[in-house]
Amino acid sequence: MERIKKRLVAIAAFCLMTTMVFAQGGHTVKGVVADEMGPVVGASVFEKGNVTNGTTTDFDGRFTLTVQNPNTTLVFSYIGLQTKEVALAGRTNISVNLEEDSELLEDVIVIGYGTVKKNDLTGSVAAVKADQLNKGVVTSPTDLLKGKSAGVVLTSGDGAPGSSATIRVRGGSSLKASNDPLIVIDGLPVSNDGISGTSSALSSINPSDIESFTVLKDASATAIYGSRASNGVIMITTKKGSKFDTGKPHVDVDFTSSISQNTKYVDVLNASELKALMEKTYGQASEAYGLLTDSDTDWQREIFQLAQTYEANASIRGSVGGKHNYMPYRVSLGYLNQGGTLKTSKMSRETLSANLTPTLMDEHLTISLNAKLMNMDTRFANTSAISQAVQYDPTKPVYDEHGLNGYSWWNYGRGTYDIANCNTMANQNPMALLNDKNDRSNAKRFIGNAQFDYKIHGFEDLRLNLNLGLDHTSSLGTVDVAPNTEQSFHNTKQSGSGYHTNYNQQHTDKTLEAYADYSHDFGKAFIDLMGGYSWQHFYTESFNEQYKADGTQPTASDYYLSTPLTNKTEYFLVSFFGRANFSYDNRYMITATLRRDGTSRFANNKWGLFPSVALGWNIKNEGFLRDSDALSALKLRLSYGQTGQQDLQAGDYPTLATYTMNTNQSYYVFGNQWFHPLRPDGYNADLKWETTTTWNVGLDYGFAGGRIYGSIDAYKRFTKDLLNYTPVAAGANLTNYLDANIGDLENEGVEFEINAIPVETRDWNWTVGFNVAYNKTTVTRLTTDDERPDYYGVTTGGISGGTGNTIQVHQTGQSPYSFFVYQQVYDTNGKPIEGMYVDRNGDGTINDGDKYCYQKAAPDFTYGFNTSLSFKNWTLAASAHANVGNYVYNNIASNGDLLTDLATNGFVNNRYRTAEEHNFTNFAQYFSDMYVQNASFLKLDNVTLSYRFGLKGRHSLSVFGTVQNIACLTTYKGIDPEIYSGIDNNMYPRPRTYMLGLKYNF
């Protein structure tokens, strides 16, 4: 397996080095390069002592090279194979066999502040290489990882262009603070926070520039990043040039085109069904029935469309310089134009990536210069149209020449086009919502770092490393709603004036990190010591204003709908860290790390200490197993560690006394002048780190010469000092509720991964990968008095329907985001009885005391599957993932089930198809457990078929077709069961996508 992986990497990184012929004459040599599996494609062939005169082998392993001296020596090299020198001795035709290089074949894994051989790993770490990543329409790098690693759950964003995925590594470790993993790109920790005008921070990175991912899961691997790593670390390595890329540059270009369509719609009544229900409920002679018209409009199909996406990427890589002083380089350009299936939504993105890696001072100084730039333009659709399309009367037409701005609308029949004639309690025309709102943004991002790595002359075991980084994002946007439109009438504050919004935001992270690393082999013993310092500054500035769009003068007192506001905030993080690795005889390993973090966010508890230790036993290298042919790897791992959390989602000053300027609704008059006074905010000076302690035990295994390999891990995590929003005694602070460290959380799970190569021949290759993970999270403490009978926990999970209703709760002894509902009572036919719930506490009254925790949003088990089958130049690849044990509250059904709302307040609501069957006429059953539905699913994510043309020389052409989001097996009754929050309401559907593409290399 290691051979195959290295071969694929080499073809991508080193193939087709250009022939440089010194003169018109000379001695021409032809030949073929092979290994035990056959011809070697992309092997480097050059004249010894003259690296500029070289070539590479073609797809048949053949080469042609002209030299001046017929007795010169040729050098043959290929990643994963031993370099070989062959004296020509006047020959014009030679055959060369290259042998496996076991040292080069050893995988090197990127970890925090360094790399480590895979065999020396002691922590729970998953590495995913470029050839293993997902295919299809991928706008964010993290989508490439879906289903690839056990315990790493990526819930794709909705179907909006550029939408982001929610990432959870082993379920998260907090309730109120961030549960996002730390993202590190080319050694630089970057912000995963979105800013105004962008749907995803990471969508600014071109996925085609990604070389590999490394996921750090347990605390022994993540503790080196301290307070930013409680939820795991995802390390992204981008593609770079290589010192072997000599000669003419190598160019890669690719182009893809795709069409996306929605395949499923909410099951509501059509026009004829609604008329029949209205007649049955009210009668044809009723005023309610008279509200209907004669159109037959499928509103969901009206607002959605076929969406086209185009993407093009081009890159150039090579290397300049000599043998010991050289500079590999890679520069890439990318363009993406993605249309949305919801009309008016679209996104375009341009990216530039440059990687320079000069190596100087006789290979003692290596400088890594990485820069990534992005420009993104987005048109956001008004997603309120999605929920309105479900509820709007299908007997009404889309357009009406006598309607408001040409659209049909609910009005009182007064013949005017003003707010007095608008039924502001009614639903709104979905197409008007889309077309009467113009929401656009432009975002730019720069991520760059310069890393200097110096091996001390005369003492090469000691390396000094300096990393300087900058992550800067800026955005500006406008939102326009024209005056005298339906949605401007429905806004009480606007009263038909419409509005114009301007906003801009910038976010800047600066990083300085320096460390020293000493490593040395002492015979059988190996030691690696590292210590360093980190300084990080995080700064955010934003501006927002909104004013009337009806021509009101700026000097008017009611011109501004929201006061222009500029906000600036910053914080600092200073750290000291160290790591010690020791191994003996490639059998026994120990790793210890220590990090001390200081944050400006905490007033009285600035510093936190985060240690870890891990042990590894390479059982395969023991004498009793060393000669086993069946067993290729067996390593036992045990680790313990602590990480912290200071990203509390409470701003940068939750522990400091701050003041806020009053709004227009709460200003005061002094004399004859109005003033906006400052009011003090509540704060808790004693807030401190959330601390997560993790135990992990793991086993890495391999059989049949590495053709079957994988890992098993079990872990348990304890988070203490959990942040919770808790009541404050009257007069004790400047607020009624305050953030405090009074909660605890437990998290446990098991992960299993297996990969296999069932077939590996010259013409056939078949790989299969499967992973499964179990995770359980339990809240163990929320307040200092959890046993109070009137304390049900922290409510969360707002829903549509009613006012301020929530459907989820954090409760001691239960999973976070459990559904907090009544137990529905059914008749003998299994039909729910309206307004009747089980009196669970037996007090004779139905109230909050009868609610109970029923299921949760998070799955118990997650699965991932991928396979690739190659025959000669054909490759067929597929991937799938599944969740089991996750539940979803179907808010669309709970909103559309009440028949009383069929006709109300002078307008008609469309109903969910179960409304007539349930026949709820008096009570909305928002809190019934019947709407909490099993959302377990199996999704076939994509299937790709590709063909590679065997062009001569250095040219390569591949064509491929992909179908994405192919099928979903589930019992859930909504559109899509994969909803991270667990609440299904107003979701932009994920479309099915058909894609064609080509790749050309020369």
Indicate residue ranges for each PLM-predicted region:
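Glycine-rich, aromatic-lined ligand/substrate-binding cores of catalytic
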Residues: 857-888
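Short aromatic-centered micro-motifs
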Residues: 76, 183, 582, 840, ...
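Short, solvent-exposed loop/turn motifs
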Residues: 39, 82-85, 189-190, 364, ...
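Short Gly/aromatic-enriched secondary-structure transition segments
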Residues: 267-269, 481-483, 546-548, 785-786, ...
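Short, small/polar-rich motifs associated with maturation and membrane association
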Residues: 1-361, 365-374, 382, 447-448, ...
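Extracellular/periplasmic, surface-exposed regions of secreted and cell-surface proteins
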Residues: 133, 180, 210, 290, ...
